UniProtKB/Swiss-Prot annotation:
SUPFAM superfamilies: HSP20-like chaperones
UniProt cross-references to PROSITE patterns, sorted A to Z: CS
Keyword Chaperone attached: yes
Start and end residues of each stretch annotated as Disordered: 169-216
Domain CS: 5-108
UniProt feature, compositional bias: Acidic residues: 200-216
Biological function: Acts as a co-chaperone.
Organism encoding this protein: Saccharomyces cerevisiae (strain ATCC 204508 / S288c) (Baker's yeast)
Modification sites for N-acetylserine: 2
Gene behind the chain: SBA1
GO terms for MF: Hsp90 protein binding; protein-folding chaperone binding
Protein name: Co-chaperone protein SBA1
Other known facts: Present with 33700 molecules/cell in log phase SD medium.
Gene Ontology CC entries for this record: cytoplasm; cytosol; nucleus
Alphabetic keyword roster: Acetylation, Chaperone, Repeat
Length: 216
């Protein structure tokens, strides 16, 4: 087993708005191969992620990852959304506390250039081009299915607000529900629906969903 703690690679982009809180956010992609047992701590002024990689053929060591970022400005922890996709990338969407048109000049509070933090140019748009890009339908969150992300730093009780249409397969939403996603959302929300009423007819390759432990 490897005892070395590794800083994972981070890519980030952002949007800003003076009037719309939903368009005032930071997107972070953390790269951790074979991500396992993630533990996320979200505070207004910082985020911290701990995880490990599972052993596999050719590398039987367990690698430990840790990321701590003191953010340039405060965020709203309870609105944070996060998800592990394919066991390779940890996606986070952080909502900025202050509504303002100016971009953050950097992700971190410290004016230090960290070698493992990069700009995500695939999602980056200049401040004066935000409205134009959005009008063209080019979302900053391309490739991230935020409808299936886990929200908040502490979780919310009840099944209210769950969009079950997002879990339906087939044309026009007429297919069978995605049982793994349904069970995951119910587990997060404390729902008590009778799963016996649902039958899965089609087997599809799905993203590996790993529910992190989140600390408020």
């Amino acid at each position: 087993m490897s005892d070395k703690v590794i800083n994972p690679q981070v890519a980030w982009a952002q949007r800003s708005s003076t009037t719309d809180p939903e368009r005032n956010y930071v997107l972070i992609t953390v790269s951790i191969a074979d991500c396992d047992a993630p533990e996320l701590t979200i505070k207004p002024s910082y985020i911290e992620l701990k995880a490990q990689s599972k052993p596999h053929v050719g590398d039987e060591n367990v690698h430990h990852y840790q990321l701590h970022i003191d953010l340039y400005k405060e965020i709203i922890p309870e609105k944070t959304m996060h998800k592990v996709a394919n066991g390779q990338h940890y996606f986070l969407k952080l909502y900025k506390k202050d509504l303002e048109s100016e971009y953050w000049p950097r992700l971190t509070k410290e004016k230090v250039k960290y070698p493992y933090i990069k700009t995500d140019f695939d999602k980056w748009v200049d401040e004066d081009e935000q409205d134009e890009v959005e009008a063209e339908g080019n979302d900053a969150a391309q490739g991230m299915d935020f409808s299936q992300m886990m929200g908040g730093a502490g979780g919310a009780g009840g099944a209210g607000g769950m969009d079950f249409s997002q879990m339906m397969g087939g044309a026009g939403g007429a297919g069978s529900p995605d049982m793994a996603q349904l069970q995951q959302l119910l587990a997060q929300s404390g729902g008590n629906l009778d799963m016996g009423d649902f039958k899965e007819n089609d087997e599809e390759d799905e993203e590996e969903e790993i529910e992190p432990e989140v600390k408020a």
